Amino acid sequence: QMNKITRPPVGGWQQPIRALYEVKVPGRKLKSFIDPQHDVTTEDVRLAHREGFVSVEHLKRYTTLGMATDQGKMGNIIGLALMAEALGKEISEVGTTTFRPPYTPVSIGALRGRSVGRHFRPLRRTPLHEWNLDHAGTMTEAGLWQRPWYFARDGETLADAYVREAETTRRTVGLCDVTSLGKIAVQGPDATDFLNRVYSNAFAKLAIGKARYGIMLRDDGLVMDDGTSWRLSETEYFMTTTTAHAAPVMAWLEELLQTRWSDLKVHVTSVSEQWAGIAVAGPCSRTVLEACVEDPACVNNGNFPFMGVIETVLKNHIPCHIARISFSGELAYEVYVPSDYGPAAMDLLWGVSEPMGGCLYGLEALGAMRIEKGHVTGAELDGRVTIEDAGLGRMASTKKSYIGSVLRKRPELTREAAPRLVGIFP
């Protein structure tokens, strides 16, 4: 089947990511530093073992590992892993050294510098940042990210540019950088049960190779976030969140697994940095994908239905995941490739789209098209909105219990006179 997801084994759900403490090159002796403050190398740790220093405290004093200002926060775990390997033990059996204050890092800003300006928090750029700038993109802040606001032509104003982008997308095809969306890997035998408890709508019967749009509520019954989750296998999902709520949603999922449902066999891992995302939207979007993938049949209407998910390869040998998802009302797809391949994938898609009369579009046009469709935007999800306010009350399940399922039924949150989000036809 074209839409069947296949992947190599990764060691079971309990070891989705293997630990790597040292990069070794056969036939070469590398000098690898593990404590840059005191110039401690991997060979220093092995020398300590050969000299008979088997205690971690002896290792620390022989090599000065972890005796600098960071008190081992940077390199100790690697040193302990190498010592454990030399002793033939587990890291937990080797033990740790005694840490001295500060036990946790102290921000330099807490000691000096009261005016921080734009340095108050980091500014994140997508793998397509330079590509967008090279194609006349005007950037704006979205959460912590820099994203294209609009792509002006020949001195266009913001209003001129976003109207043209929206009209072109609805008429032919448009490409949009959506890398900033939060991306979370949900893995484990109980992953389906976990998502079914977190989302207000049903996920228990979601088939492999399909995606579903979900609404996540807080305990008080108000909307926390929305996004899609793709089922990649029996035990693995790929969840997307809004840009602004990526970190809060990740923290919320971790809290639920650690404090409420610690019996569930589930791991959640942020993979936002690992994938570059490109939305391909418009009546000609399928034609663009057919010209860009190695097997055009995998994206035809019969093999790739609405909310379907496939794993395929682009013509420039780039592996990718594609979901048939639309947030603008048109036929649309989301294409995710490994981050380093983002510019190359965009070059390929744009090389096909531009001759067809397609365009690049930014957040302003995306917001306009979402409003026309009646789909919630970031402005609506401000922590004071109910699922009924968002016009999505019918999605909420009446057959299961989920986070916020009780308090969302409070009279004040379900009154008929409350404002409702509706679509505006273009």
What are these regions (language model features)?
Residues 22-40, 46, 68, 145-148, ...:
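Cofactor-binding beta-sheet edge motifs in enzyme active sites
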Residues 53, 163-179, 223-236, 268-271, ...:
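Residues forming anionic-ligand binding surfaces in small-molecule and nucleic-acid pockets
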